[in-house]
């Protein structure tokens, strides 16, 4: 437009206009003056406009009516020259758009007049065209008039004018619609278009904008005209043809679809006018039936008219293509009509144009997709797309089934018109005859029908022949085979189009998301439709639903048609195309997961590959894919699927045997079979990824073909033609011989190409091969015929070529070999399976995987897993192969096994106990190799498995040596852990962190044994646990070795453990082991085990299971106790140490109370161990502190370390602990907590002591009596224990202790043991037990001594305990009801070793005497203690000593009473002063009578001295008696005033009694001299005398002892004198004994001394009674005068002399009497 607006263009326009006007003026000068004037005034007008206006063009347009008037007048002259000049000038104005609406109307009116006068017709058309194309000022009636003008010119008699007018009409119609489109574009920004719904109602035309209204009126009138109705708008039309109208309608619909789609008014026209019009015009075609009447008879039905019909089909094509969304129902009708026109009763040309129309649709896959969406996927709607495909199939079948008709009216187009019967066969036979039946023309031949294949179009384009014949009036002649060829191309293009489209879209989706998986049901479309309608599904799901529906809709029809064509094809290219179509459909169905349809297409190809009626079960199975005898419903007709005909018109290329169990006849293969086979191979090769389960079909077919062709698997798995011997019936032509290498090569490449399959597809391939293999194995079961090795060979081949992703197929592949082949009864097949399996495993391990195997644990495990699975096969040959394979792997790959170790170790560990010694030995060799060579190379995470496997060999009971060696291996493993601890720990921690992270990501907790201990600690714990299991093995040797190793390991390497891990060691390992050992020990069999055969003897201490378990119990308990002792500093800070301590104590207690002496004694040794007499230090380099200062005799032997002759050492060296505890500060344990532990120990000790020493209530053979070593050990524990609890040790505890000590000492010993324990009876030696008891009490009294005041109340209890022991000297304790014998009477000779034991009482005298010494010693220290005073300890001592003192010579041991009296003297020397101090308190009141009785019983004992007592001994004994009297003299009588009078009286009486010689009747005459205790008597008398003359008395109260002594002395003198007189008288001449003479002399002297003393005493101090007694002596003295002894006489004289003073009473006396 810029060119017409530029100043230059405007200037030129003005010049041209003036020039035109001048020319017009010149031409009309003479003839037409008015025109001339108008022209001249026009010039002036133009000049004026140019001068006055800047916008010249606008001004011209405004005045255009005036400007154009001269030219219109010129046209009115009807002069050709002037008219041409004017029309040219008008066109120039139009081209510059300076014509107003009015001017334009005037121009059109002028043109109309010219048209009616038939002037300048071509120029008119040109002018109209310029007017309408250059501007938009012409509207409404002016426009309609212009269009009618063109139509009128179309129907002139001049062909040139007609054709030009036709072109102009077409152009004008286009312009009208283009204007509308431009108008819409202008208004689009203001009013966005509303999309038209298919069911929209008509809107008023008045709402349309001007251009739209014009277009609407024009289109409406075109419909009117085609329908032969009068136009509403195109007024003035005189003539119109239907064909031209249809062409115009088609062009508008085709060129301006958006007009109809965007405007409801136009869409209304489409629905209400166009569609009904088309349907009406189709009426003759629908109703017409070919052959219903002859052509000569009058036709009641209007015949189809080719030009109209063909144009209608073109319109329908446009309607369908552009407006299916608007015209859902109408398009459904049109498509149904198209399908109907294919019916065999329609004219041949109609069927041809219909199939061409359908072809047009078939090359538009997007259009087909729309049909599917709009119709097939809607409920209750015609399945249009399905019907089209089925109609094509039906059409093709009809062309084969119906021979040509002989109708002369259509003979020239017959080809094969479908209406006649067999009678018309000759018409066709001529055609066949031309080729002589062996024509080389491509054709389809089926059951006598021969149809040539014509080249009708290039594939992919629908170049129609008959739809383009717009100039033809008569129906064209259709060549033979044309319809078939077009229909064939329809099928191929349909397949190509939809597969290309869907695969393209599918590719885009798959590029974004996951691929479709097999199993998506092809039946799910309807359900998906509903979902698509109701749910806002995502685009992919909707698309997938459409694809699936399209395939579902068309596959049946396609397959029916293609199968028929395949069977009928005699042309290799056509066959290739058909097979390609089937192949692409199969591949597409596969990609969409439509299993049924995929399998159907594949089955068709498979059937085509095999000879007719070949008995292949996989193809004849009753699946949805089965083709034979299947009916598909096509357009309501039941059309049988045509199976391949047996009347083969193909070249036979091979004859062979079928693959079957039963021998059958031969079968023939044709070239088409081979072609199909190649397609099948191609399908498998290129589309293996989507074959899925149909691999079964493909491979089964290939296997049979291979067998028929005689191809056999060679060593590498490739197939080669077999030897003639193998297939005597196989005959191959040269034609197929050239194909065989190719086929063989493709087969090999097929399995090689499996490396390009996706994973799912590869699985399907493997599954199919496995199924084939199973078939072959089944055949091999029942007969000796060679099995087909196809499947197994290809399994191996597939495995080897897919090694890069072997994990995908590994499980099914190896699973099949493992579960089926390796377990086949046929040993060769089994062996082959094992060989294949191990080969695959080895190949897998040597393959360079990416990432490498050491970094790909999962893959390595996968590869090795079948090796492990072979363990489940029971055939020994397979197991041997397996272990050999393991050995090979270890030797070749051992260093790089990495993560594969667990499985390799698992294979070794899987050898079961019952699998024979040789397999176990082989497996154990593998393990030994691993432990010696490969521990450093394997991942640390596998070390635990090594431990488990080694442990499992320990549990094998086939051979003891293997078990013991495996325990040795465990020790070696632990050493390895110890040496490489740091490295192993780092690696394990790293692995643990990775696993922890994975577990957290998965949201699960880490699951490993002994979690949450650190991983390195877990390794140790597993080792300990495994050794723990072996510690309870049924075999004693294994138990012993395992126990020693366990405790050695913990002892030697335990410091490597984290502190917290000790908790697990204690609870999960040690206590768990103790529990199991205790349980086994307590339930073990007591039956005696017979000595084994040969020279093996079992020691009597191990001859029952119970005794053997006892050894284990001892070892275990000792080990645990040692750990508690040596690792106490580690264990005590643990949170629940006190609970652990309690459990350990419980174990010690239960063991200590065991009836087995070995166990019980060991338990006490363990108890002693854990009490830690010496506290452990943190580092062994520190000097150990001196032991607690308690002399505890320890019976423990040196507990040298158990296990492998390694000493039990504490390895807490600085080096080891630097990394462990060095940085930690020692944990200071709470003292209270510590105290609690010791009290728990005390309670355990108390319970153990109480229960073990409790005397039996009844006596039977089963009574258990604890041994002396046990009791000794028990008591020896106390002092150490007491050091920890003394602060809280109460009186009640002391009493408990006393009970135990008393009971322990009371226990007798077995006569078996007595020779080893008892000292000889004469030795005064204590047993260890007695020593221990006294030590315990010693510890106690020492602690009390230095302890606080409140402890001293315990002294009396100590005394009581000791005094109880003292009593044993005379009265040995009784142990319950047990009968004991004296040691001398017990039998303990060695010959009676196994006789029932007797119980021997011990010699308690030394013990009692030692106890007495302790009492004295203790009393000396404690006599003054308040408690000792209050609790009458002295009285108790005296009371206790009274027994041996009264027995005196009757005591079991002479030493006892001597010690007792000595002790009494010592005790009294200390105690009497104390008693005097407390005289007033009365605390000793009860003691005096006890003392008096004791002294009385001792000094005047009833026991008789033994006969063999020597004189010296007697004298020594008498001196002891004298000492006692001296004590009385020194300690009692001087303090008489502080002592009860009764007691003093008793003393005096006793002295009186003692002072008279007593003569036992048993003395011989010779002994009387010395046996009369002369010294004793003298001492008594002297004492009496001494106290008679005590001048110290100052008060009468203090003098009572003197008075008492005098009284006793005088009485005693009187008695002696009387007895002497009597004896003298009786003796006659015989002299009296010397002692008696001495005694009488002594008495006489004493009397004289007494009287002298009395005289000297103050008179007031002498009692009158005393004098009376003295005077009473006188008559007796006088009687003695007659005695014969001179000595007596002189003494008598001295005695009588003092009596002279009594002859007169003294003065004082008188005075006293007076006063």
Swiss-Prot record:
Residues 506-540 are annotated as: Disordered. It holds the Pfam family Mon2_C. Keywords: Acetylation, Endosome, Membrane, Phosphoprotein, Protein transport, Transport. InterPro entries: ARM-type_fold, DCB_dom, Mon2/Sec7/BIG1-like_HDS, Mon2/Sec7/BIG1-like_HUS, Mon2_C. It is found in: Early endosome membrane. The modification N-acetylserine is found at residue 2. GO terms for cellular component: cytosol; early endosome membrane. Its main location: membrane. The modification Phosphoserine is found at residues 204, 534. GO terms for biological process: Golgi to endosome transport; protein transport. Belongs to the MON2 family. Homooligomer. Heterotrimer with ATP9A and DOP1B; this interaction is retromer-independent. Interacts with SNX3. Plays a role in regulating membrane trafficking of cargo proteins. Together with ATP9A and DOP1B, regulates SNX3 retromer-mediated endosomal sorting of WLS away from lysosomal degradation. This is Protein MON2 homolog.
């Amino acid at each position: 437009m810029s060119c017409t607006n530029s100043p230059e263009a405007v200037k030129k326009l003005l010049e041209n206009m003036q020039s035109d006007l001048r020319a017009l003026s010149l031409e009309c000068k003479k003839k037409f003056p008015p025109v001339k004037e108008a022209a001249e005034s026009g010039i002036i007008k133009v000049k004026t406009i140019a001068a006055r206006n800047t916008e010249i063009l606008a001004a011209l347009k405004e005045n255009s009516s005036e400007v154009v008037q001269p030219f219109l007048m010129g046209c009115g002259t009807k002069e050709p020259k002037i008219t041409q000049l004017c029309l040219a000038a008008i066109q120039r104005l139009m081209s510059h758009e300076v014509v107003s609406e009015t001017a334009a109307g005037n121009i059109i009116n002028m043109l109309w007049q010219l048209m009616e006068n038939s002037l300048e017709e071509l120029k008119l058309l040109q002018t109209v065209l310029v007017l309408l194309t250059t501007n938009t000022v012409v509207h409404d009636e002016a426009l309609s008039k212009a269009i009618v003008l063109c139509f009128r010119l179309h129907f002139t008699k001049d062909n040139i004018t007609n054709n030009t007018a036709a072109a102009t009409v077409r152009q004008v119609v286009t312009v009208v619609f283009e204007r509308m489109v431009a108008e819409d574009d202008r208004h689009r920004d203001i009013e966005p278009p509303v999309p038209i719904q298919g069911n929209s109602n008509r809107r008023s035309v008045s709402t349309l904008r001007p251009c739209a209204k014009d277009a609407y009126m024009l289109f409406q009138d075109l419909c009117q005209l085609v329908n032969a109705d009068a136009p509403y708008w195109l007024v003035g039309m005189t003539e119109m043809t239907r064909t031209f109208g249809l062409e115009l309608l088609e062009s508008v619909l085709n060129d301006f679809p958006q007009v109809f789609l965007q405007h409801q008014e136009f869409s209304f026209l489409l629905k209400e006018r166009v569609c009904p019009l088309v349907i009406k015009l189709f009426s003759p075609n629908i109703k017409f039936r070919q052959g219903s009447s002859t052509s000569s008879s009058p036709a009641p039905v209007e015949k189809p008219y080719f030009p109209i019909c063909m144009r209608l089909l073109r319109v329908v094509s446009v309607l369908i293509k552009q407006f299916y969304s608007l015209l859902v129902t109408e398009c459904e009708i049109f498509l149904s009509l198209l399908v109907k026109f294919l019916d065999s009763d329609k004219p041949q040309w109609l069927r041809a144009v219909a199939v061409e129309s359908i072809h047009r649709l078939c090359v538009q896959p997007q259009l087909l997709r729309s049909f599917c969406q709009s119709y097939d996927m809607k409920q209750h709607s015609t399945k249009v797309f399905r019907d089209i495909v089925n109609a094509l199939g039906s059409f093709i079948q009809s062309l084969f089934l119906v021979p040509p008709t002989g109708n002369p009216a259509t003979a020239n187009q017959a080809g094969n018109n479908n209406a006649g019967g067999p009678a018309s066969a000759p018409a066709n036979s001529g055609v066949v005859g031309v080729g002589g039946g062996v024509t080389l023309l491509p054709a389809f031949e089926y059951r006598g029908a021969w149809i040539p294949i014509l080249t009708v179009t290039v594939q992919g384009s629908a170049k129609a022949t008959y739809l383009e014949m717009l100039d033809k009036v008569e129906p064209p002649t259709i060549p033979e085979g044309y319809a078939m060829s077009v229909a064939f191309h329809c099928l191929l293009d349909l397949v190509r189009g939809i597969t290309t489209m869907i695969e393209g879209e599918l590719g885009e989706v798959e590029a974004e998301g996951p691929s479709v998986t097999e199993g998506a049901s092809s039946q799910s479309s309807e359900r998906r439709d509903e979902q698509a309608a109701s749910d806002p599904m995502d685009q992919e799901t909707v698309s997938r639903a459409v694809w699936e529906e399209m395939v579902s809709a068309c596959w049946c029809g396609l397959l029916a048609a293609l199968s028929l064509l395949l069977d009928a094809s005699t042309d290799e290219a056509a066959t290739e195309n058909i097979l390609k179509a089937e192949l692409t459909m199969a591949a597409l169905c596969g990609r969409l997961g439509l299993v049924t349809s995929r399998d159907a297409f594949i089955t068709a190809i498979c059937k085509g590959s095999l000879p007719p009626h070949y008995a292949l079960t996989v193809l004849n199975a009753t699946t949805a894919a089965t083709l034979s005898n299947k009916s598909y419903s096509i357009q309501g007709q039941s059309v049988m699927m045509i199976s391949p005909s047996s009347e083969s018109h193909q070249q036979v290329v091979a004859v062979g045997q079928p693959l079957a169990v039963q021998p059958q006849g031969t079968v023939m293969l044709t070239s088409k079979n081979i072609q199909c086979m190649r397609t099948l191979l191609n399908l498998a090769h290129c589309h293996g990824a989507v074959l899925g389960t149909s691999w079964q079909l493909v491979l089964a077919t290939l296997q049979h073909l291979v067998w028929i062709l005689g191809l056999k698997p060679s060593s590498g798995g490739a197939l080669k033609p077999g030897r003639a011997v193998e297939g005597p019936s196989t005959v191959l032509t040269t034609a197929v011989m050239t194909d065989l290498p190719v086929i063989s090569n493709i087969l090999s490449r097929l399995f090689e190409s499996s490396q390009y399959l996706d994973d799912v597809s590869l699985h399907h391939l493997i599954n199919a091969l496995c199924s084939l293999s199973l078939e072959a194995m089944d055949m091999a079961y029942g007969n000796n015929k060679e099995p087909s090795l196809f499947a197994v060979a290809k399994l191996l081949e597939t495995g080897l070529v897919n090694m890069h992703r072997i994990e995908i197929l590994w499980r099914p592949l190896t699973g099949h070999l493992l579960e089926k082949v390796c377990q086949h009864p046929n040993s060769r097949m089994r062996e082959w399976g094992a060989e294949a399996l191990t080969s695959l495993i080895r190949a897998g391990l040597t393959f360079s995987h990416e990432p490498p195997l050491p970094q790909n644990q999962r893959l390595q495990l996968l590869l090795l897993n079948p090796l492990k699975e072979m363990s489940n096969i029971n055939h020994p040959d397979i197991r041997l192969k397996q272990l050999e394979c393991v050995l090979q792997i270890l030797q070749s790959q051992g260093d790089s096994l990495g993560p594969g170790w667990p499985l390799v170790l698992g294979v070794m560990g899987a050898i079961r106990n019952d699998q024979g010694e040789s397999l176990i030995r082989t497996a154990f060799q593998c393990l030994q190799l691993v432990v010696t060579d490969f521990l450093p190379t394997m991942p640390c995470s596998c070390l635990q498995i090594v431990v488990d496997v080694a442990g499992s060999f320990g549990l094998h009971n086939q051979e003891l040596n293997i078990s013991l060696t495996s325990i040795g291996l465990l020790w070696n493993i632990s050493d390895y852990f110890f040496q490489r601890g740091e490295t192993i720990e780092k690696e394990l921690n790293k692995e643990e962190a990775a696993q922890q992270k994975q577990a957290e990501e998965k949201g699960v907790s880490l699951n490993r044994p002994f979690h949450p201990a650190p991983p390195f600690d877990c390794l140790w714990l597993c080792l300990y646990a495994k050794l723990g299991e072996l510690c309870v093995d049924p075999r004693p040797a294994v138990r012993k070795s395992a126990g020693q190793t366990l405790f050695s390991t913990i002892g030697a390497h335990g410091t490597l453990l984290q502190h917290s891990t000790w908790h697990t060691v204690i609870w999960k390992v040690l206590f768990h082991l103790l529990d199991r050992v205790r349980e086994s020990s307590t339930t073990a069999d007591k039956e005696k085990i017979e000595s084994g055969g040969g020279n093996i003897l079992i020691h009597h201490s191990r001859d029952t299971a119970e005794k053997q378990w006892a050894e284990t119990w001892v070892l275990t308990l000792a080990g645990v106790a040692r750990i508690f002792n040596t690792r106490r500093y580690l264990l005590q800070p643990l949170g629940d140490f006190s609970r652990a301590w309690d459990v350990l104590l419980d174990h010690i207690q239960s063991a200590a109370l065991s009836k087995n002496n070995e166990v019980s004694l060991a338990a006490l040794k363990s108890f002693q161990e854990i009490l830690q007499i010496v506290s452990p230090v943190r580092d062994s380099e520190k000097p150990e502190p001196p032991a607690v200062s308690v002399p505890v005799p320890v019976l423990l032997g040196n507990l040298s370390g158990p296990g492998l002759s390694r000493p039990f050492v504490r390895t807490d060296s600085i080096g080891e602990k630097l990394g462990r505890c060095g940085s930690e500060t020692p944990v200071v344990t709470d003292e209270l907590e510590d105290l609690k532990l010791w009290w728990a120990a005390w309670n355990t000790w108390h319970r153990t002591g109480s229960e073990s020493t409790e005397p039996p209530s009844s006596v039977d053979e089963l009574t258990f009596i604890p041994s002396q070593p046990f009791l000794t050990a028990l008591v020896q524990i106390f002092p150490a224990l007491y050091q920890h609890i003394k602060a809280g040790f109460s009186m009640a505890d002391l009493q408990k202790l006393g009970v135990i000590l008393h009971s322990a000492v009371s226990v007798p010993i077995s006569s078996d043991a007595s020779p080893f324990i008892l000292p000889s009876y004469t030795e005064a030696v204590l047993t260890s037990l007695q020593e221990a008891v006294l030590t315990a009490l010693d510890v106690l009294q020492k602690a009390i001594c230095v302890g606080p005041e409140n402890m001293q109340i315990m002294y009396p209890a100590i005394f009581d305990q000791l005094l109880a022991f003292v009593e044993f000297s005379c009265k040995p304790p009784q142990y319950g009801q047990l009968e004991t014998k004296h040691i001398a009477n017990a039998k303990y000779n060695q010959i009676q070793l196994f006789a029932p034991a007797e119980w021997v009482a011990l010699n308690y005298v030394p013990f009692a005497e030692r106890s007495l010494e302790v009492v004295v010693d203790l009393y000396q220290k404690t006599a003054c203690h308040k408690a000792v005073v209050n609790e009458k300890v002295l009285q108790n001592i005296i009371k206790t000593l009274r027994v041996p003192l009264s027995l005196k010579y009757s005591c079991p041991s002479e030493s006892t009473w001597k010690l007792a009296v000595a002790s009494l003297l010592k005790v009294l020397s200390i105690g009497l002063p104390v008693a005097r101090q407390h005289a007033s308190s009365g605390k000793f009141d009860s003691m005096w009578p006890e003392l008096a009785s004791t002294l009385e019983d001792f000094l005047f004992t009833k026991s008789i001295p033994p006969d063999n007592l020597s004189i010296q001994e007697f004298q020594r004994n008498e001196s002891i008696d004298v000492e006692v009297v001296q004590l009385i003299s020194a300690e009692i009588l001087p303090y008489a005033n502080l002592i009860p009078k009764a007691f003093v009286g008793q003393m005096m009486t006793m002295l009186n009694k003692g002072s008279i010689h007593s003569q036992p009747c048993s003395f011989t005459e010779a002994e009387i001299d010395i046996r009369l205790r002369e010294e004793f008597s003298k001492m008594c008398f002297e004492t009496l005398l001494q106290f008679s003359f005590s001048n110290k008395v100052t008060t009468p109260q203090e003098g009572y002892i003197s008075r008492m002594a005098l009284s006793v002395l005088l009485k005693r003198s009187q008695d002696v004198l009387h007895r002497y007189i009597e004896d003298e008288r009786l003796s006659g001449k015989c002299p009296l004994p010397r002692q008696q003479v001495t005694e009488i002399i002594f008495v006489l002297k004493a009397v004289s001394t007494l009287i002298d003393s009395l005289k000297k005493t103050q008179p007031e101090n002498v009692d009158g009674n005393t004098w009376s007694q003295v005077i009473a002596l006188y008559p007796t003295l006088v009687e003695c005068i007659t005695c014969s002894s001179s000595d007596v006489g002189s003494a008598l004289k001295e005695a009588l002399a003092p009596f002279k003073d009594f002859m007169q009473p003294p003065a004082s006396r008188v005075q006293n009497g007076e006063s």
